[in-house]
Regions:
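C-terminal cap of metal-dependent C-N hydrolases
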Residues: 265-299
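Alpha-helical scaffold segments that flank or form the walls of functional sites
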Residues: 1-56, 79-89
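Short acidic/histidine-rich active-site segments
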Residues: 123-130, 193-195, 200-224, 261-268
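Metal-coordinating catalytic core of metallo-dependent amide/deamination hydrolases
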Residues: 41-165
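Glycine-enriched alpha-helix->loop->beta-strand junction motifs that scaffold or abut catalytic
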Residues: 54-56, 115-122, 154-157, 174-183, ...
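Catalytic beta/alpha-barrel core
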Residues: 100, 158-167, 184-190, 212
């Protein structure tokens, strides 16, 4: 993957965005928070591809101080924030995204957190995705990742913690107190073998949830929602941990809120699709979440 990332040109990136956003729109995605690791030409390609596909795009520009590929990194947090300004000036809707506590030192997190708050921008960050990340954070900072985000001013109602797979109770309490959102990415977490979101503990604390794909391995928002409920059922030993309405909100209202949108385009469902044959009108939503794939989406 890293070798492929190194050889990407704006033209190749544009082709990838066009393919991916087309697939996403056909599957029922209408808005995307794009973790963007590259420069302005590639960002403009993302904007154009999203517009052509009918996708509302929020570009979450990634901050990388260490690790990753050289082309992902910025020389300083000031240089990173200048890139964010340039993207905004180019007409893109933007958010900030310190990649992780591994990739960004505490000083960067403080500056990015302050900038996000001052400019009312969404702040997305990977945290508690893998045990090794937690071990490294404890060794460097003496605290766990979400605790570090709180210490550096990165936790607030505008914050979205991606994954939170291994968050402990104290960290979940911090998220709840801050009004921060968790973005679960069930199919990617399964693909990488990262573990399971502590869904029941998240639910009981009232922490807002949304879902993301986090990769193009599977592009199916209904599958993400179904897998999230499946995880919760396996953890608790009971059905219906999240209601149908809650699950659909994770993929719509709460997802839009997580990327700073107040509204989002609707989708159309083929009610004559074989997956919905015989389903009464008041059960369509439940049938969508429990048993349908992206092929029921018609527009």
């Amino acid at each position: 993957m890293l070798v492929e990332a190194e050889r990407q040109t704006p033209e190749l990136v544009r082709a990838s965005y066009e393919q991916t956003y087309c697939e996403m729109r056909l599957a029922g995605y209408t808005a995307v928070g794009e973790f963007h690791y590259l420069g302005v030409p590639e960002a403009l390609a993302a904007r154009d591809a999203a517009s052509a596909a009918g996708i509302e795009l929020v570009l979450l520009h990634v901050a990388y101080a260490r690790g990753g590929l050289p082309r992902f990194r910025q020389d300083s947090v000031a240089a990173y924030l200048e890139e964010v300004e340039a993207l905004s000036s180019a007409g893109l809707r933007v958010g900030v995204a310190p990649h992780s506590v591994r990739a960004c030192p505490a000083e960067w997190l403080q500056e990015i957190g302050r900038y996000a708050s001052d400019h009312a921008l969404p702040l997305h960050v990977h945290a508690d995705e893998q045990p090794r990340e937690i071990e490294e954070c404890l060794a460097e900072h003496g605290c766990r990742p979400i605790e570090l985000l709180a210490r550096t001013g990165c936790l607030g109602a505008h914050t979205v913690v991606v994954h939170a797979t291994h968050a402990d109770g104290a960290e979940l309490d911090l998220l709840a107190a801050a009004g921060a959102t968790i973005c679960a990415c069930p199919t990617t977490e399964a693909d990488l073998g990262d573990g399971f979101l502590p869904a029941e503990r998240v639910r009981t604390r009232g922490i807002p949830l949304c879902v993301g794909s986090d990769s193009n391995m599977r592009i199916d928002p209904l599958e993400e929602l179904r897998e999230l409920e499946g995880i919760a059922r396996r953890q608790t030993g009971r059905r219906g941990v999240f209601s149908t309405g809650e699950l659909l909100s994770f993929g719509s209202a709460q997802g839009a809120r997580a990327i700073g949108l107040e509204s989002w385009p609707d989708i159309a469902i083929d009610l004559d699709h074989r997956s919905l044959a015989g389903v009464e009108s008041d059960c369509v939503a439940a049938a969508l979440v429990a048993g349908c794939g992206a092929d029921v989406v018609t527009g």
